[in-house]
Structure formats: structure tokens, C-alpha cells
């Protein structure tokens, strides 16, 4: 099994962390990318997933309300569903949970829907 390098993780932190109009807790960003690197464990699949997250964040920032409203303990948050790689008939395996503050998009977390465990249960604790 390939391991994602620290340099690649740092680059991913930089790319996602500097997305204009997006704010996210740094510790949560690092945690989410570390988990992502264990799921998409080859350089190619990791880069594809990070690029899709970055693209989706820009789309969310531009459009604001393009996704599902959450309920219960995550009410006032939204969930955006998308593919880790753009392939016909691939299910939307990635999620971004965010809130529009009016001034910026506050990201609570991102990751694979099911791996390594339920995404929503993981970010609920934040």
C-alpha cells in the first residue's frame, strides 16, 4: 500500500485551506485530510479527491445553497454530495458539511460518506 507523503498532505492543506471565501478549523482540516489519505491511499486517487473537494468548495462558495439541508443535531448545516473522481455512474462518495454565515462559508468537515466509518457521526462531535 502506498503512503501519501507529508509534502503532498501539506500541499492539500494549502490548496483547501486557501480556498477563497471558505473557512475551516485547521485541526479539522488536518484530521479530514489525514483520514482522506488513508482512504484514497495512492497519489493519483488522493490528488483526484483533493481536487474534487477544492472544486466543490469553490462551487459551494459561488452558489451557496446547492445542497441538502441537514436536520437534528446538524440543523442549520448543509451537506454537499459529490464524486471523488468524475466518472459516469460512480456514486457520490464524498461529502462536505458547511454553513453559509453570509460573509463566508464555514466548513464543518469533509470526507468519504462511509469510510472509515459514518461521516456524519464523525463530524457531529466537532
Model-found features: residue ranges?
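Enriched for short, Lys/Arg-rich terminal
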Residues: 1-17, 21, 74-126
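Arg/Lys-rich, positively charged N-terminal/basic patches that mediate binding to nucleic acids
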Residues: 1-58
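Intrinsic disorder/low-structure terminal segments
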Residues: 45, 70, 79-81
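Short, contiguous, well-structured surface segments enriched in hydrophobic/aromatic residues
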Residues: 55-63, 71, 78
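Phosphate-/polyanion-interacting regions in eukaryotic proteins
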Residues: 67
Amino acid at each position: 500500500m502506498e503512503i501519501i507523503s507529508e509534502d503532498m498532505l501539506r500541499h492539500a492543506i494549502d490548496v483547501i485551506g486557501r480556498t477563497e471565501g471558505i473557512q475551516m478549523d485547521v485541526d479539522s482540516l488536518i484530521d479530514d485530510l489525514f483520514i482522506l489519505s488513508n482512504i484514497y491511499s495512492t497519489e493519483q486517487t488522493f490528488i483526484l479527491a483533493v481536487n474534487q473537494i477544492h472544486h466543490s468548495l469553490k462551487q459551494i462558495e459561488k452558489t451557496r445553497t446547492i445542497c441538502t439541508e441537514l436536520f437534528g443535531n446538524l440543523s442549520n448545516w448543509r451537506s454537499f454530495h459529490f464524486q471523488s473522481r468524475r466518472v459516469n455512474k460512480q456514486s457520490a462518495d464524498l461529502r462536505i458539511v458547511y454553513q453559509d454565515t453570509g460573509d463566508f462559508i464555514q466548513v464543518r468537515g469533509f470526507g468519504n460518506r462511509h469510510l472509515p466509518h459514518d461521516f456524519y457521526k464523525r463530524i457531529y462531535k466537532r
